[in-house]
């Protein structure tokens, strides 16, 4: 998989993306089901004679270790990609020309599809769809007496855009990429004219997607499945992933808003959701970093 250095580099990256996707499914179904047992006081024991609470604790310990390992392998792969001229960087580290290009890209493609959401007494915390990435931002205005008046807003990272943005090359062999959420947080002041940015935090919520269908009670199985699918889209939160420099006040605010506890938080060293690398693995001209496509032949 991602560890075996004999495996082509982009196949190792693809494996990391697959593992990330599988872990999402595991939380949406298996962890959600165990949480459901705990909440409803259902006592069931598995083959190791562990109840749901004990299983959840063991899962948490394993997943925390797994996520750390995954990030180590990912960083190794991204570092190796630099040997082939592929660099993942931050918007603030770009040269003047590249920053100008990115500013134009932001104004043309990103700004029009991002809708900031206010969170205050008149605007409750919005329902954030499963696996979307969002930034919570604390903004302020200076009052006449010199104090800061704070507000909270959510910047949804649009899923209609590719998470990985390539910066046009400067005629050399280097390919440079930035992440969509970094561009949005880097330009966050564009969304809040007249406000200062105090701090922000990028996060991702995983929701319960376990289908609960009571076949005994359901007179019409089709409508029961449809109702279950509707509930699934608005399932309870089961995991919160955060990355970067985590601000405790913002983390507590999100936890309270989505009804999770500190034990449900996974702090990610790097960018959230490795599934974004699936597309990158098909980058043209890098066939030497992929397996040779299998061509079926007639016997």
Spell out what each predicted region is.
Residues 1-299:
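N-terminal localization/anchoring segments of enzymes in phospholipid and broader phosphate metabolism
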């Amino acid at each position: 998989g991602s560890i075996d250095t004999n495996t082509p580099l982009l196949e190792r990256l693809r494996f990391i993306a697959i593992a990330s996707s599988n872990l999402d499914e595991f939380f949406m179904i298996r962890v959600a089901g165990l949480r459901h047992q705990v909440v409803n006081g259902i006592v069931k024991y598995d083959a190791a004679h562990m109840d749901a609470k004990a299983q959840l604790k063991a899962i948490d310990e394993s997943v925390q270790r797994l996520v750390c390992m995954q990030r180590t392998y990912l960083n190794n792969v991204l570092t190796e990609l630099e040997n082939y001229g592929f660099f993942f960087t931050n918007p603030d580290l770009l040269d003047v020309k590249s920053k100008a290009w990115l500013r134009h890209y932001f104004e043309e493609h990103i700004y029009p599809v991002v809708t900031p959401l206010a969170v205050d007494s008149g605007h409750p915390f919005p329902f954030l769809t499963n696996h979307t990435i969002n930034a919570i931002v604390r903004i302020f205005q200076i009052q006449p007496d010199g104090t800061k008046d704070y507000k909270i807003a959510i910047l949804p990272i649009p899923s209609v855009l590719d998470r990985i943005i390539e910066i046009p090359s400067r005629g050399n062999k280097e390919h440079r990429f930035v992440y969509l959420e970094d561009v949005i947080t880097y330009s966050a002041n564009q969304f809040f004219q007249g406000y200062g940015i105090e701090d922000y935090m990028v996060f991702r919520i995983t929701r319960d997607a376990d289908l609960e269908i009571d076949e005994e009670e359901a007179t019409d199985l089709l409508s029961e499945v449809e109702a279950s699918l509707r509930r699934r889209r608005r399932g309870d939160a089961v995991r919160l992933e955060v990355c970067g420099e985590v601000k405790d006040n913002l983390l507590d605010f999100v936890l309270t808003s989505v009804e999770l506890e500190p034990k449900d938080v996974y702090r990610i060293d790097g960018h959230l959701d490795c599934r974004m690398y699936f597309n990158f693995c098909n980058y043209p001209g890098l066939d030497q970093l992929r397996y040779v496509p299998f061509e079926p032949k007639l016997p």
